[in-house]
Amino acid sequence: MIWDTDSIIQAYAQGYFLMSDEEGTLGWYTSSQRTLIPLDDRFRYPKSLQRVLNQERFTVAINRDFPAVCWGCANRETTWISHELIEIYLQLNQAGWAFSFETWQGNQLAGGILGIAIRGAFIGESMFYNIPDGSKVAMVKLVEHLRARGFVLFDAQLQNPHLARFGSYGISDREYKLLLRKALSSKCHLI
């Protein structure tokens, strides 16, 4: 199937997201309960992570190695990121919609977050790490970056225990669409 970039972005702007099922078939999904990462003072992280941040062991980059972040996010026993979806992410990256927010330790990719930025909305697709704390530092630094750029929404799509450590919270689909509309009316740029 050929996926048109404009149609993909329009669907994300309406609250849908792409996922592959267990057979690798790509489809559009939505959720009645959406998970957000707070961009206000509700954002938090473990105190042990503050020590890591203070040590400045990681540097941060955007799109330094976008393909590696895609493959890092997909490289797990059970994944919803198929080869076809990686090709779509690469296409969206080339068009200026998909981004990787990365942490590095020297020349080694430590971790990263893959997402789609549409005006004031950042839709986080996945995250991974190669070095312990790499993705956690990426999360903290991404939130700082989104705040500095005036983003309204950091959509994490689905809740999990890891995201809960950062203060993630759920909202109804109706609330989500109202917030998404507000985010889409903002003129923000990730880079």
From Swiss-Prot:
GO terms for molecular function: leucyl-tRNA--protein transferase activity. Its EC number is 2.3.2.6. InterPro entries: Acyl_CoA_acyltransferase, Leu/Phe-tRNA_Trfase, Leu/Phe-tRNA_Trfase_C. It is an enzyme of class 2 (transferase). GO terms for biological process: protein catabolic process. GO terms for cellular component: cytoplasm. Keywords: Acyltransferase, Cytoplasm, Transferase. Disulfide bonds: none annotated. Pfam families: Leu_Phe_trans. It is found in: Cytoplasm. It catalyses: N-terminal L-lysyl-[protein] + L-leucyl-tRNA(Leu) = N-terminal L-leucyl-L-lysyl-[protein] + tRNA(Leu) + H(+); N-terminal L-arginyl-[protein] + L-leucyl-tRNA(Leu) = N-terminal L-leucyl-L-arginyl-[protein] + tRNA(Leu) + H(+); L-phenylalanyl-tRNA(Phe) + an N-terminal L-alpha-aminoacyl-[protein] = an N-terminal L-phenylalanyl-L-alpha-aminoacyl-[protein] + tRNA(Phe). Functions in the N-end rule pathway of protein degradation where it conjugates Leu, Phe and, less efficiently, Met from aminoacyl-tRNAs to the N-termini of proteins containing an N-terminal arginine or lysine. NCBIfam families: aat. Belongs to the L/F-transferase family. This is Leucyl/phenylalanyl-tRNA--protein transferase. The lineage of its organism: Bacteria, Bacillati, Cyanobacteriota, Cyanophyceae, Oscillatoriophycideae.
